[in-house]
């Protein structure tokens, strides 16, 4: 099973090995998809792998040190507004958006992490974010 989450923590926990402790204490595998760490807070997008029970245990552990929010379907593209210009492609940090061999923009929506870079880049406002 795989689950993606947003994770926020404050300055009290930034210098602690929370992610590695979560892995060691629960057996979950964690992929850090995005991390923004500042002196007063940290924001991460995490992808957790394991059984349902292992992932739930890991989420409970992480929530002791910060706020966890599950990422569901994040982006939606309006095909009537999209002109396949590709502005969104270069802004996607995990290559969820790409151009196929026919020069059409393709979204792998199920892999989106919700960074919202594509939304900001689209000059035609063809991308919506589910909050």
Curated annotation (Swiss-Prot):
It comes from Methanocaldococcus jannaschii (strain ATCC 43067 / DSM 2661 / JAL-1 / JCM 10045 / NBRC 100440). Its cofactor is [4Fe-4S] cluster. Binds 2 [4Fe-4S] cluster. This is L-aspartate semialdehyde sulfurtransferase iron-sulfur subunit. It comes from the Archaea. [4Fe-4S] cluster 1 binds at residues 82, 85, 88, 122. PROSITE patterns: 4FE4S_FER_1, 4FE4S_FER_2. PANTHER family: ADENYLYLSULFATE REDUCTASE, BETA SUBUNIT (PTHR43687), L-ASPARTATE SEMIALDEHYDE SULFURTRANSFERASE IRON-SULFUR SUBUNIT (PTHR43687:SF6). The lineage of its organism: Archaea, Methanobacteriati, Methanobacteriota, Methanomada group, Methanococci. InterPro entries: 4Fe4S_Fe-S-bd, 4Fe4S_Fe_S_CS, ACT-like_dom_sf, Fe-S_Ferredoxin, NIL_domain. The keyword Iron applies.
């Amino acid at each position: 099973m795989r689950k993606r989450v947003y994770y926020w923590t404050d300055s009290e926990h930034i210098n602690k090995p929370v992610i590695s402790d979560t892995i060691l204490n629960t057996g979950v595998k964690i992929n850090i998809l995005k991390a923004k760490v500042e002196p007063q807070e940290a924001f991460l997008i995490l992808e957790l792998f394991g059984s349902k029970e292992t992932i739930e245990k890991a989420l409970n552990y992480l929530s002791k040190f910060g706020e966890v929010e599950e990422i569901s379907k994040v982006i939606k593209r309006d095909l009537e507004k999209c002109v396949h210009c590709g502005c969104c492609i270069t802004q996607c940090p995990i290559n969820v958006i790409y151009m196929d061999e026919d020069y059409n923009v393709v979204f792998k929506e199920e892999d989106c992490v919700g960074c919202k870079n594509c939304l900001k880049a689209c000059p035609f406002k063809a991308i919506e974010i589910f909050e």
